[in-house]
Amino acid sequence: MSREDLEARLRAIGAERYHDKHPFHHKLHGGDCTPDQVRAWVINRWAYQAAIPMKDAAFLSRCADPDIRRAWRSRIEDHDGGVDSGGGLRRWLKLAEAVGLDPDYVASGRGILPATRFAVEAYFHYVREQPLLQAVASSLTELFAPKIHENRIEGLLRHYDFADESSLSYFRKRLSEAPRDVAYGLGWVLDHADTPEKEDMACAALIFKTDVLWAQLDALWGAYVDGHVPPGAWRPGEGMA
């Protein structure tokens, strides 16, 4: 398979399976979520956000090639930031505060749905333990992220009073960060998936990652749209500022 054909195959996975197609995102971006449904999303998405720099650190610890480490370490800096300026994690907590939550409560991880936690932990262990090709390929959902961030910014600004440039700064910043990150990751996968077996492995890794993202939204829907909140998960009124 040519590089162009493999890239087309990877992009087709996103076209079919990326979580921008999930009903919860349609509900959120269309202005149909209640304030508590938005809060539940912010709380549970934190589990994924907080794991990103840790999974990237785990990935770096496995890389003997300094060129890979140099290219990859900016991902940690994007989310952790500096002591004073912070990064993506601090910007996410700005969103938490804007929707009425106590940022310390959100950062504590209390109230996260069990299924969300399991999905995030599965992703962390996948990146830490699978061959480098699959670990890198699992990051290629970033190919599809700018579109969902654009739709989210537009939808939240249109429909929700909490939304402004400060509260949505995480998504605005990712519009420039994600394309830079994924350009390297995509090139690396196209260079190293050089047999049919490796092409299949790369595609399976991307499918796995789309499943991780989709499962988190399924959990949110079941708990906070259908109303089946499991024991120990966040309930409206908890963790408020």
UniProtKB/Swiss-Prot annotation:
Pathway: Cofactor biosynthesis; pyrroloquinoline quinone biosynthesis. Coiled coil: none annotated. It comes from the Bacteria. Disulfide bonds: none annotated. InterPro entries: Haem_Oase-like_multi-hlx, PqqC, PqqC-like, Thiaminase-2/PQQC. One of its GO terms (molecular function) is pyrroloquinoline-quinone synthase activity. It catalyses: 6-(2-amino-2-carboxyethyl)-7,8-dioxo-1,2,3,4,7,8-hexahydroquinoline-2,4-dicarboxylate + 3 O2 = pyrroloquinoline quinone + 2 H2O2 + 2 H2O + H(+). SUPFAM superfamilies: Heme oxygenase-like. The keyword Glycosyltransferase does not apply. One of its GO terms (biological process) is sulfur compound metabolic process. Keywords: Oxidoreductase, PQQ biosynthesis. Its EC number is 1.3.3.11. Belongs to the PqqC family. Ring cyclization and eight-electron oxidation of 3a-(2-amino-2-carboxyethyl)-4,5-dioxo-4,5,6,7,8,9-hexahydroquinoline-7,9-dicarboxylic-acid to PQQ. This is Pyrroloquinoline-quinone synthase. It comes from Ruegeria pomeroyi (strain ATCC 700808 / DSM 15171 / DSS-3).
